[in-house]
UniProtKB/Swiss-Prot annotation:
Cellular component aspect of the GO annotation: plasma membrane; proton-transporting ATP synthase complex
Any one Gene Ontology BP term: proton motive force-driven ATP synthesis
Marked site: Required for activity: S363
Binding residue positions for ATP: G170, D171, R172, Q173, T174, G175, K176, T177
Lineage top rank: taxon: Bacteria
Protein name: ATP synthase subunit alpha
Designated gene of the protein: atpA
């Protein structure tokens, strides 16, 4: 084979022409200790707080502590054999981001937005920063649109508005998750996108919730973020921020979203674990000093935006689990002071058959009243007072049997109101039907029936109005208020039902 000098020189010239001078510069550090989801890294002098790090084996990490001679980072994933002392960690120069957008709807993802439902990758090119500043005062608008839960006791006495933060608090096994799931199911056919964040729960429980949501067609507008009990503390800590980042995408694009954190006590425990491993000084109940900020910066991101900012909203329903009804513990008092009200669920009520087990005296909605539908405001105005008086009288009535007629009537009415406000799980009720049944109870239409027949009366009332008085339901739905004319129609219809219903 003949070697041609001109050919060789041509190839060399071409190579020189195409030679790229780019040099890849990476800032790296060395792991000096690792364990329990925490790595200490030497050599990352320019790392930022909250920065994303690249660990060996494709695992990510997040910078939490910036110290004089090392950096403390949380490993966002399972500790694997590739992450050990002496291995190299790279800086990315980016803050932790998660995928956001419409493509996530109907999916179940982990704490960093990766799909775990076996339905393939999520096709989205949009990412959102996990840590961002909450909207300022100028960007906000006061809460004025209702967010219906479909639960009579809540929509009538503890109304929630779009953009509000309403805490659901109670002991374990009092129906906190049930209230949240019913609220999601009630949004079917509406314009709310729901995000359910499961923190520190059993995988079987999360699977059960997802199957219930699928059964009622609610996964069509729901995203589930799961950081189960078996996952490392850093993932349980970051999951709520991942969820709120996904919700903010809809809020900032003029849409309406609802996010449920189930539950924040477990997130606080995970954060306590992280902080103690990072050797941060412990405070009350061994929680770090910034545990209030942990929840306040999360919940402040739920807001109703002003018209100039697109008028979107993000409503938050955080859940907190109490120990033996102790609402004055550290985390419960923190979250109560951050939120715009709380729904307090009581185990005594739950076991006595009052479900949802809402304690009306301790539950309050600080801003929801201005968002409540006017018709509901008209019928439920005295409901809370009547129930509070009934509870007080019932306590005294235990001591004496000879009660006057007025007291007996008030006790009978109260008993019926409590019965009417009971509701089975997974059966949210539209607002106009709630108004009707509370109107009937308030105006004495159920006084003569025994308490045991009220559940049947309620279902017959709904079917009677659905089949024969649909115009009244439509008028209630459209007007959202009760005028004299509509009131007369409602009374006439209820009188007609009274003749037909036999207890």
């Amino acid at each position: 084979m003949e070697i041609r000098a001109e050919e060789i020189s041509e190839i060399i010239r071409k190579q020189i022409k195409e030679y790229g001078k780019e040099v890849e510069v990476a800032e790296t550090g060395t792991i000096i200790s690792v364990g329990d989801g925490i790595a200490r890294i030497h050599g990352l002098d320019k790392a930022m707080a909250g920065e994303l790090l690249e660990f060996p084996g494709g695992v990510s990490g997040m910078v939490l502590n910036l110290e004089e001679d090392n950096v403390g980072a949380a490993i966002l994933g399972e500790d694997n054999e590739n992450i050990k002392e002496g291995t190299t960690v790279k800086r990315t120069g980016r803050i932790v981001e998660v995928p956001v957008g419409e493509a996530l709807i109907g999916r179940v993802v982990n704490a960093i937005g990766q799909p775990i439902d076996g339905k393939g990758p999520i096709n989205t090119t949009t990412f959102g920063k996990v840590e961002v500043k909450a909207p300022g005062i100028v960007k906000r608008k006061s809460v004025h649109q209702p967010m219906q839960t479909g639960l009579k006791a809540i929509d009538s006495m503890v109304p929630i508005g779009r953009g509000q933060r309403e805490l659901i608090i109670g002991d374990r096994q009092t129906g906190k998750t049930a209230v949240a799931i019913d609220t999601i199911i009630n949004q079917k056919g509406g314009d709310l996108i729901c995000i359910y964040v499961a923190i520190g729960q059993k995988r079987s429980t999360v699977a059960q919730v997802v199957s219930k949501l699928q059964e009622y067609g609610a996964m069509d507008y729901t995203i589930v973020v799961s950081a189960s009990a078996s996952e490392p503390a850093p993932l349980q800590f970051i999951a709520p921020y991942t969820g709120v980042t996904m919700g903010e995408y809809f809020r900032d694009n003029g849409k309406h979203a609802l996010i449920i954190y189930d539950d924040l006590s477990k997130q606080a425990v995970a954060y306590r674990q992280l902080s103690l491993l990072l050797r941060r000084p412990p405070g009350r109940e061994a929680y770090p000093g910034d545990v209030f900020y942990l929840h306040s910066r999360l919940l402040e991101r739920a807001a109703k935006l002003s018209d100039d900012c697109g008028a979107g909203s993000l409503t938050a329903l955080p859940i907190i689990e109490t120990q033996a009804g102790d609402v004055s513990a550290y985390i419960p008092t923190n979250v109560i002071s951050i939120t715009d009200g709380q729904i307090y669920l009581e185990s005594d009520l739950f076991y006595s058959g009052v479900r949802p087990a809402i304690n009306v005296g301790l539950s309050v909605s600080r801003v929801g009243g201005s968002a409540q539908v006017k018709a509901m405001k008209q019928v439920a105005g005295t409901l809370r007072l009547n129930l509070a008086q009934y509870r007080e009288m019932a306590a005294f009535a235990q001591f004496g049997s000879d009660l006057d007629k007025a007291t007996q009537m008030q006790l009978a009415r109260g008993e019926r109101l409590v019965e009417i406000l009971k509701q089975p799980q997974y059966r949210p009720i539209p607002n106009e039907k709630q108004v009707l049944v509370i109107f009937a109870a308030n105006n004495g239409f159920v006084d003569e029936y025994p308490v045991s027949s009220l559940r049947r009366y309620e279902s017959e009332l709904y079917s009677f109005f659905d089949s024969r008085k649909a115009d009244i339901l439509a008028e209630l739905r459209d007007k959202k208020a009760i005028d004299d004319d509509l009131k007369a129609k409602m009374i006439a219809a209820l009188e007609e039902l009274k003749k037909e219903f036999t207890a």
